[in-house]
Amino acid sequence: VQKERFRYFIKVPELAAFYNEITDYRTAEDVGVDRPHKNEILHHIPPTPEQEDFIQKLMQFAKTGDATLLGRPPLSETEEKAKMLIATDYARKMALDMRMIDPNYEDHPDNKASHCAKTIAEYYHKYDAQKGTQFVFSDLGTYQPGDGWNVYSEIKRKLTEDYGIPASEVRFIQECKTDKARKAVIDAMNAGTVRVLFGSTSMLGTGVNAQKRCVAIHHLDTPWRPSDLQQRDGRGVRAGNEIAKHFAGNNVDVIIYAVEKSLDSYKFNLLHCKQTFISQLKSGAMGARTIDEGAMDEKSGMNFSEYMALLSGNTDLLDKAKLEKRIASLEGERKSFNKGKRDSEFKLEAKTGELRNNTAVIEAMTEDWNRFLSVV
C-alpha cells in the first residue's frame, strides 16, 4: 500500500509565525529545569570483513533486485515495488550484527556488540564506587525468551565472560512480564543493584523513572522519530539524576554506535535535522524558507542514489547525489517561477488593455458630460 507523508515544506517563516500565534512554546532550559546536560558521542566502527562483503551484495541487490544475493527467494511482484525498503531493512540489520541476517555468521571482536560491551564495561568500572547505571537501547534484535540469538543476550554474554560483570546486574526490560516485576527492576536501577538495563524504545523509552544513578545511554540503533530519541535520552537526562550531578560534571554521555559505510550516521544526522526543524519551528527561529525533511523513513526506505553513495563510502557520490537533488529542486523552482512570470505577464497585458479601454470610456464620458453642461 502506497504511503504518503509531508516531506518538503515551503514558506517556513510564515508557518512558524502562524504556529506561534496559537502556542506558547518553552523548553526545559527556558524554564530552568535542573537536569544534566546531554553529551552526545558518535562512536564510529569500521565494518568487519563479513560486513564489507555483504555491503557489496546489498549494492548489487539495489541495482538488480536479485534477492538471491541476500540468501532469500526471488522478489515477488509486490516485493519488487518495495525493493529499496527491503534494501534499507537489510542494511540496518547488517550494521547491528551480521547474525541478524544469518545466525550462522561468526562473532567478531570489532562488531558493534563488541564495541558496545567494551564501552559499557569502561563506564561500569569508572563509576563503580557510585554504582553508576547505564541504559542500552535497540529496537532490532530485542530479547525474546526462547527465541534464539539476539543482540541483548550477546552483549550480556560479553559483559559477564569478558569483563567479569555479574549477570544479576545486567537485565532486560522484556523480562518484566508484570507491573510489579517492572517496578522491581526500576527500583533496583535507582538503588544500583542493577547496573545495566537493555530495552526497546516502546518498552524502556517511557514510564521508566530510573534516572537516579544514570551516567551513560547507549544507542545500538537510531529510531525513526526525533521524539523517540528524546524519550530514550530522557531516561537519564532528567531531573533527579544525582550521580551525574555530583560525580559526572552534571553530564550524561549519550553514545551512538555507527558502522562506517552503513546507514547509521546518515540516519542519525537525518534525525538531528528533523529535530532542529521542529525546535526552530516551535521557537519561531527559522532561517531557511524551505525545509527538506529527507528521503528516508520506515515506510519507504531511502532512494537508490543516496543508498549507493552511503554504502560505497564514497563521499563524492554522496555529494553528487545531494547536488543532483538540489539541481532538481532548483529546476522545479525555475519552472514554477517562469510559470508565475508568464501568468503575471498575461494578467498585466489584460489589465493594461482594460486600463486603456476604461481610459477611453472615461474620456468619452467626460467629453459627453462637458457637452451636456454647455447645452444646459
Locate the predicted segments by residue.
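Conserved helicase motor "Helicase C" RecA-like lobe of SF1/SF2 P-loop NTPases
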Residues: 141-172
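Conserved helicase ATPase core of P-loop NTP-dependent helicases/translocases
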Residues: 166-201
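A short beta-strand element within the Helicase C-terminal
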Residues: 209-222, 253-256
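Conserved strand-helix element at the start of the C-terminal RecA-like helicase core
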Residues: 72-87, 129-153
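Conserved helicase core region in the C-terminal RecA-like lobe
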Residues: 46, 187-188, 197-206, 221-224
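Inter-lobe coupling linker of SF2 helicases/translocases
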Residues: 1-106, 110, 118, 122, ...
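Conserved SF2 helicase motif VI
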Residues: 225-247
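C-terminal accessory regions of helicase/translocase ATPases
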Residues: 121, 158, 162, 302-376
